[in-house]
Amino acid sequence: MAALPDADILCVDLVRIFKVQAANGAGVEVQALQGLNLRIDPGELVAVVGASGSGKSTLLSILSSLDQPTAGVAWVAGHDLLTMKEKERVAFRRRSVGFVWQQTSRNLLPYLSASENVAAALAITGEAKGAAARRTRVTELLDLLEVSHCADRRPPEMSGGEQQRVAIAVGIANRPRVLLADEPTGELDDTTSAHVLEAMRSVNRELGVTTLIVTHDPAVSEHVARTVQIRDGRTSTEVLRSTRLDEHGAEQHVAEEYAVLDRVGRLQLPDDFVAALDLRERVRLALEPDHVGVWPGQQARPEASVFPDEPPTEEPS
């Protein structure tokens, strides 16, 4: 038996192809994911950012076991998503992962109070058996998310931010290894969004829940240590954020962007790089001692650049 991956989320060469019908009635294949690779280790808080049509929603559907990939590898919380039966998928969604969706109607039952919504999640998942244990767990979760004042309120009586924080409490009621959030701030203003994201950071930090936020909003990346950009069905770049001390002992917040190199050596150049240099079809590469240079195909390669073991190119006479 192969060893289980030590990552909480692992995708290798993930492909998802949909068959759709064109206007003329012909069948057309649409490739939503094109060999996507992603690894998220236990306890990480990661944002996956991408424009509409980039493949991020398809990725989340696969990670939540609501959809199956066409090919590749997908593991979440120690479960192989490609081999699970339907009964195993139901158990996986109830016990191993938690969810926070953009729409309140998907997170909370409108006719139940905040405490009743959390208690219902506990009852469904089998956590905190017994009424007393459930009440204690409900109180703990609402206190953690700072919405204990909403305990007796129904969703229509709460603000958007309060609804989402209660939704997070519902999402972690089953003590999941992984929390998946789909556009959790999509319907909120900037200030409220920041409060909700800080609540997710608090859950990640205090409970150690591996958290993945899928969003189209680049501002979300300011609240996480790692941001993965998806473009054309693949991971294209990553931004890693850290806090360092300068020579005077003052804190500096540093963000470093990296291109993602896949297993066969492919990478996607950022759109602004491509546009700035007017890169098209072919580019020239040059191997330097400590980096690789990229030039537009119509420009001559700098003479100082060399490829190892490559014979000199002679211009035709």
Give the residues covered by each predicted segment.
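Helix-to-loop junction immediately C-terminal to a conserved catalytic motif
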Residues: 64
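Conserved ABC transporter NBD signature motif
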Residues: 72-80
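Conserved ABC ATPase "signature" region
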Residues: 80, 119, 126, 131-150
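ABC ATPase NBD coupling module
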Residues: 81-98, 131
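Conserved signature/switch motifs of ABC ATPase nucleotide-binding domains
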Residues: 94, 153-156, 173-174
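Short coil-to-helix segment of the ABC ATPase nucleotide-binding domain corresponding to the Q-loop/switch region
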Residues: 111-120
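ABC ATPase C-loop
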Residues: 147, 151, 166, 171-172
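Catalytic Walker B motif of ABC-type/P-loop ATPase nucleotide-binding domains
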Residues: 179-182
